[in-house]
């Protein structure tokens, strides 16, 4: 079995800055504080290798698997994941549902259904729907006792969401959620933005705190 990555080996933004592996953005992002940098991590790797409490899958409305990261997560989890997903009756765009992780090294899989960019943008709903995926996933994580969550780059694959816009929306949603209810957000120790492609990693680097 390929090696997995424990949470202790996923660097926070604070560590990335102090070790000069990350350069602060030229323009200060809104709502920046040290708590964000201590809680948020950025890593480029295969999300199926992360030993976080939960990982967030870029699912489709059927929840029955697909291409890209969705297919990779289903393959790594094994057929039992599909069997559980078949009982969930799908999921609406902008929402999320949670399952066991089966053969994955994490504890839970949160299946978030991001918007198809072109269609959602025509309706003026693309940002709201994508941000809803992140906040709903965090709420599910808290409700299920998951203290660390790793997000894939939702909607940036075949759904066509530009990486820069997606990263800005994702980081804005996460920071807004952290600030909205300090008592509730304290139940999450780490939020990881996990990218597989360089274009997504570079986009996160432009918009992180």
Map each language-model feature to its residues.
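Glycine/small-residue-rich phosphate/adenosyl-binding loop
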Residues: 74-119
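Conserved active-site and cofactor/substrate-binding residues in soluble primary-metabolism enzymes
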Residues: 50, 64, 68, 76, ...
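Phosphate/ribose-phosphate-bearing ligand recognition and processing surfaces
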Residues: 117-209
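Eukaryotic N-terminal low-complexity, Ser/Thr- and Lys/Arg-rich leader segments
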Residues: 1-38, 209
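Structural motif
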Residues: 40, 53-55, 95, 107-111, ...
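Short, conserved "active-site rim" segments that organize catalytic pockets and cofactor/ligand binding
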Residues: 37-93
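Conserved, mostly hydrophobic/aromatic
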Residues: 56, 73, 110, 151, ...
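Short amphipathic alpha-helices and their capping/turn segments at secondary-structure boundaries
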Residues: 43-47, 92-103, 137-143
């Amino acid at each position: 079995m390929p090696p997995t990555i424990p949470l202790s080996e996923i660097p926070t933004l604070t560590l990335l800055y102090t070790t000069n592996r990350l350069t602060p953005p030229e323009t200060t992002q809104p709502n920046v504080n040290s708590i964000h940098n201590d809680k948020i991590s950025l890593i480029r790797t295969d999300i199926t290798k992360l030993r976080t409490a939960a990982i967030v899958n870029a699912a489709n409305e059927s929840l029955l698997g697909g291409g890209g990261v969705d297919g990779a997560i289903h393959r790594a989890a094994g057929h039992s994941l599909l069997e559980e997903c078949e009982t969930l009756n799908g999921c609406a765009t902008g929402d999320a549902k949670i399952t066991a992780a089966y053969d994955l090294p994490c504890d839970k899989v949160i299946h978030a259904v991001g918007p198809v960019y072109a269609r959602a943008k025509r309706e003026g709903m693309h940002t709201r729907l994508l941000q809803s995926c992140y906040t709903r996933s965090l709420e599910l994580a808290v409700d299920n006792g998951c203290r660390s969550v790793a997000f894939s780059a939702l909607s940036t694959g075949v759904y066509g969401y530009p990486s820069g816009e997606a990263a800005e929306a994702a980081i804005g949603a996460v920071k807004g959620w952290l600030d909205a209810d300090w008592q509730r957000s304290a139940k999450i120790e780490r939020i990881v933005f996990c990218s597989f492609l360089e274009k997504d990693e570079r986009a996160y680097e432009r918009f992180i705190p």
